[in-house]
Amino acid sequence: MIIGLTGKNAAGKGELANYLKNKGFIYFSLSDALRDEATKQDLDHSRDNLIKLGTEMRVKFGKGILAVRINEKISELSGKDIVVDSIRHPGEIEELKKNDGFILIGVHTDAKIRFERLVKRGRVGDTQTFEEFLEHEKKENAHEGAGQQLDKCIEMADTTINSNGTVEEANKDLDSYRNSLEN
């Protein structure tokens, strides 16, 4: 089974990915692929830089380039359970769908809760104020072409998990969905 996770910043994708890793899933993140490329180019890992770099890579190499790089790794892991985090463009989804058994899960969490999580997380490159957070939301959702299109990705999801509550509640919803696929 290959599970892809998409959702807005601090929605809880990483928590669900960690839960699946603890259940034996092999983990890949498209954001890590971006961070690796930023390091190669000696760029700061700020959110703005990563968004810009992702757009540049999609223009230069194709809209699914980050997923193409992950698919190369997935192809070596036939039959393994895999989770792919940080899917932010429909082209990436199309590439990942080339894998048998790919399922896309959208993770939804209200903006205020996501901002509170982001502040608590304290990751380098994250925004500092709620207004900055909302401005970044616009950047992540208003693009056409090679830019991030999170709303479109969420619309393409096979199911959506609401992550407004506790991590345990979201994990339970994920397990329920996975069990429904096996029956």
Task: Please state what every model-predicted region is.
Residues 64, 120-173, 177-180:
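Small-molecule kinase domains that catalyze NTP-dependent phosphoryl transfer to phosphate-bearing small molecules
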Residues 85-86, 96-124:
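Conserved phosphate-donor/acceptor-positioning beta-strand/loop module used by diverse small-molecule
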Residues 8, 20:
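P-loop (Walker A) phosphate-binding loop of NTP-binding proteins
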Residues 11:
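ATP-binding Walker
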Residues 14:
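Walker A/P-loop
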Residues 26-83, 87-94, 125-126, 131-134:
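ATP-dependent small-molecule kinase phosphotransfer cores
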Residues 27, 104, 159-162:
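Short, well-ordered beta-strand core segments
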